[in-house]
Amino acid sequence: MKSKSFERDLSPEKTEAILDGAMQEFLENGYAAARIDKIAVAAGVSKATIYRRFPDKESLFTALMQQLACKKELFNSTQLQFAQGDVASFLKSFATMMLNRVAEDPQTLTFLRIVIGESGRFPELARAFVQNIEKPMLESLTQYLASQPELELPDAEVAARAFMGTMVHFVMLRDILHSGDLVPMECDRLLDNLVKLIIRPV
């Protein structure tokens, strides 16, 4: 039977504190240079407590991705699952929401830069990002488009990838590479015409 102290170590409050401390450490020092002992200090727990909940640094980083996807709802696939009404209006509002949330959250942008920057040395981090964030979103968007027979899409998955890929490219230029002024494009113009390409296939 587990002791009360052990149960307290695994409490939701301590888990949240660990994740907050980990986010702070990863954002300040990147993945490779991040240290568990500094995370423990920031979280106000022992290293042993962290290892009881997260066996290694990779599992801790993956948990942060899951938190990013769920808690902040930056990439919320649930909205796609329960979408109703006009397809064009919904797609634009959905895309606008995603782009705005990314742009308005510096912490998320820094986290994305870490994933991209560390992907060469730690490909498992990039794969975890795709598994926890990109894949669910792509699958949900594919299902949504496939459920709209009036669109007469030849391939819903290709359409979903084109839609998501355009937004990812926009974020990369504007927010990650700091080059929105070099290749300017108004968000409304981009999304209005992107939606037209999707709902009016050639």
Residue spans of the language-model regions?
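Short, charged helix-capping/linker segments at alpha-helix termini
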Residues: A32, E150-P154
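Amphipathic alpha-helical packing segments from all-alpha helical-bundle domains
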Residues: P123-E150, R189-D192
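Basic, helix-initiating cap at the start of DNA-binding domains
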Residues: M1-V45, R52-R53, E58-S59, G85
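Amphipathic C-terminal alpha-helical segment
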Residues: N100-E104, Q143, A160-L182, L197-V202
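Amphipathic alpha-helical segments used for helix-helix packing
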Residues: V102-Q131, M172-L177
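A short secondary-structure junction motif
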Residues: Q67-F75, D105, F122, S140, ...
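Amphipathic alpha-helical linker/stalk segments
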Residues: T62-F94, L141
